[in-house]
Regions:
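Short glycine/threonine-rich loop-to-helix capping motif typified by GTGT followed
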Residues: 134-143
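Catalytic cores of enzymes that engage adenine nucleotides and/or redox cofactors via long glycine-rich
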Residues: 1-117, 146-153, 157-174
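Conserved helix-adjacent loop modules within structured domains
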Residues: 117-119, 140
């Protein structure tokens, strides 16, 4: 936990993530248990920026759950919580994005990593989502559905919440 803040935005490697997400997503680890262990760690070794950021990420996870309780099906509309028109969708461009054949080396490497491993760092998830939405003009819902089909740590609440945020169609319209 002490190093988490310094490594949390890494793109690849073994140290860029807590590796909790597959366990949390499958229900094999509860957020409550993770939090209890985090507090025990802090009691023994002291709090740090890293342990704070782990706690903060657990809060984001809960925040996305509360969004679903409040807004329900609205979160799945093309406009999300906003009033924007439905995004365009170019099936050919979306297919290239899914296969990692966009011509953008970092985006392509990230998408091929996802296909090969079922995992991608949080920072790369944000990057490829932004690329689909802002550079390709793609439909954020198609990207969210692709992540649902590919991620080993898929969590409906976090996935939908993050895609809405990046698309500027959630509670923060800036995206």
């Amino acid at each position: 936990p002490h190093r988490y803040k310094a490594t949390r935005n890494g793109l690849t490697g073994v140290d860029f993530s807590s590796k909790f997400s597959p366990w949390l997503a499958s229900g094999a680890l509860s957020a409550r248990t993770a939090y209890a262990h985090l507090k025990a760690f802090e009691a023994e070794r002291g709090a740090s920026d890293g342990s704070y950021w782990l706690w903060f990420e657990l809060l984001w996870r809960d925040y996305f759950r509360f969004l679903h309780l409040k807004y329900g099906r609205q979160l799945y509309r093309a406009a999300g919580l906003g009033k924007q028109p439905a995004p365009s969708h170019d099936p050919a461009a979306f297919g290239r994005w899914c296969r990692g054949e966009t011509g953008e080396p970092l985006v392509d490497a990230a998408m091929r990593e996802l296909a090969a491993t079922g995992f991608m760092s949080n920072r790369l998830r944000q990057l490829v989502a932004s690329y689909l939405i802002n550079d390709l003009g793609g439909d954020w819902r198609a990207g969210a559905a692709w992540f649902e089909a590919q991620l080993i740590d898929y969590d409906v609440y976090s996935n939908q919440g993050n895609w809405l945020y990046i698309a500027g169609r959630g509670t923060d319209p800036r995206g």
